[in-house]
Amino acid sequence: MISIVWQGDHRYNVYRSGEDIGCITVSDNPCHNTHRYLNLGLTQYDPSISKDLFSRLRKELGQPLQIMLYSKPEMYNFLTAGGFERKRRCYELEVTSSDLAVPLIPAVELHAAQKGSTLYDTCCDLLYAYYSATHDTVSPLTVSQDVFCSDLPKTVLCSMVGSDPNHYAFVEPDETGYEIAYVGTTDFSSFSCFAQTLVHELFQKCDSLTAECDDTDPAAMQLMQLFNISIDGSYDTYILE
């Protein structure tokens, strides 16, 4: 028998047949506010209690539930037994040129634009639409374009068809090299050529690159395929509608 007791400060204590088995913290994300976010702090993850526990929380909170964590078999079994579905896997890349799967062929011209320029703003328009589309089936974007774009890196690299950008990447220096923070495209069929040119260009400036690649983002997956690396695990998103 599972019971949950609201403790204030965004926290529920969880009891199993009267025994305290930890707590669950609830939070909100203004960028994706159709879901309530859960952080699990339990002392046991027994799949036999999952359905009862999460049914109670879902009813109590009145919105779909979202959990994000590094997946392990124990947690996967616990969450799916409770009705959660793994909707997204995020792979964290930390790569150097020695990790390349194939020689790069830089075949497109890159244009750099800084925050405040017309080209930068156009790329922001495209990214907002692209990000919204690739996240809609996982956790819909719920902030305005102005708010979303206010936190983007100040530099975008893009390729053009005529006067219009078709592929783009928002990048910024980090502690070890460059982070490719966001990528997007209007044409998946030619994005790989852009990605090769992008990576080639950045490796002229630094020794290492980082990126987070969601399996729901086809452009990010094409970027990831440029590297021959073994990634241990992923940071996953689970949803209970």
Predicted segments, located by residue:
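Short beta-strand micro-motifs in enzyme catalytic cores
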Residues: 10-13, 36, 89-94, 155-157, ...
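Acyl-donor-binding surface of acyltransferase catalytic domains
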Residues: 45-108, 198-200, 208-241
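Short glycine-aromatic motifs
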Residues: 2-4, 8-9, 83-86, 153-156, ...
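Compact recognition or signaling/catalytic modules
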Residues: 152, 157, 162-241
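Conserved N-terminal entry element of GNAT/NAT acetyltransferase domains
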Residues: 1-6, 96-117
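Flexible, substrate/cofactor-facing loop regions flanked by secondary structure
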Residues: 106-178
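Conserved donor-binding loop and adjoining core beta-sheet/short helix segment
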Residues: 1-56, 162-190
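Flexible, charged surface loops at secondary-structure boundaries
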Residues: 6-7, 58-63, 150-153, 203-205
